[in-house]
Design a protein with these regions (language model features):
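Alpha-helical transmembrane segments and their helix-helix packing motifs
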Residues: 2-270
Length: 270
């Protein structure tokens, strides 16, 4: 009897220390996607607006760190940790972030292709994207038109934001695909990260920031700051940055991760 209990305890410990199978992770994300698709438009809007506002803290924190550090080659290694803060707030706070939904809600659609489900995914994407961008714009406008921060910090806002606008359309699109890929992989890793969830978010968001990969929400806080301060035109804000970063993030999140993961586990099941 004692031997059996010891064996059961040992098996339990082995299971606790073993990474969950990929199909279990897939099913967890799939069910989360189903839950998101059942949410009302009003709830998605409010959560998406909160997420857009929260992402503004990525620019603020990175700028505050940069303003208090010397201009040295190693400075971004520290300041880009600030870029992670917006993602930490949004994801741990379970707010609706557009790039997160490119993975979760697309899995149910890929498994059961129906017009009604496609329209529901389109509804969720549109509502969350618009709410995120509205929140990002409000935050950026407040930074540009209030005295929340002194002139020195606002100058850093401009420097960081102008750097994100420097690449051409194609470069922003391709880099955006890499950003979408990484954020979707973050979502894939989170369900069973348990106590390591915070570090998963920080490390991946830090990599996105350090590599200067454009994120359609975090990056558009910077974009909208320049627009609100009169540094760029409306055409530049939308045509040069918003459009390519959006396309790139969707390609990375859907084509490179969601479709690949779906194919891997559905083919295995068949």
């Amino acid at each position: 009897m004692a031997t059996r209990k010891a064996q059961e305890k040992r098996e339990s410990e082995i299971q606790d220390r073993t990474a969950p199978p990929g199909d279990v992770v897939y099913e967890a994300i799939y069910r989360e996607g189903e839950h998101e698709l059942e949410r009302r438009t009003s709830a998605l809007t409010l959560s998406g607006l909160a997420a857009g506002l929260s992402m503004g803290f990525s620019l603020v924190t990175e700028s505050l760190l940069r303003a208090h550090l010397p201009d040295a080659p190693w400075t971004p290694l520290i300041t880009k940790f600030g870029y992670s803060l917006g993602f930490v707030i949004v994801i741990l706070g379970r707010q609706q972030l557009f790039t997160k939904n490119t993975l979760t809600v697309i899995l149910p659609l890929l498994k059961e292709w129906k017009v009604a489900l496609l329209l529901n995914v389109a509804r969720l994407w549109a509502v969350v994207l618009i709410a995120n961008l509205l929140g990002a714009f409000i935050f950026a406008w407040l930074l540009a038109h209030t005295n929340l921060f002194d002139e020195n910090i606002r100058r850093v806002f401009t420097e960081i934001s102008m750097k994100s606008m420097a690449p051409d359309f194609v470069t922003i699109l391709v880099r955006g695909a890499l950003a979408g890929w990484l954020i979707a992989l973050m979502v894939w890793l989170l369900p069973f990260a348990e106590t390591g969830r915070l570090w998963v978010i920080i490390i991946i968001a830090y990599l996105v920031g350090l590599a200067e990969l454009p994120h359609v929400i975090a990056g558009n806080v910077e974009n909208f700051y320049l627009l609100s301060s009169g540094s760029i035109s409306l055409g530049q804000a939308f045509g040069h940055f918003l459009v390519p970063s959006l396309i790139g993030n969707v390609i990375g999140g859907v084509a490179l991760v969601a479709v690949g993961a779906h194919a891997e586990f559905t083919v295995a099941d068949d």
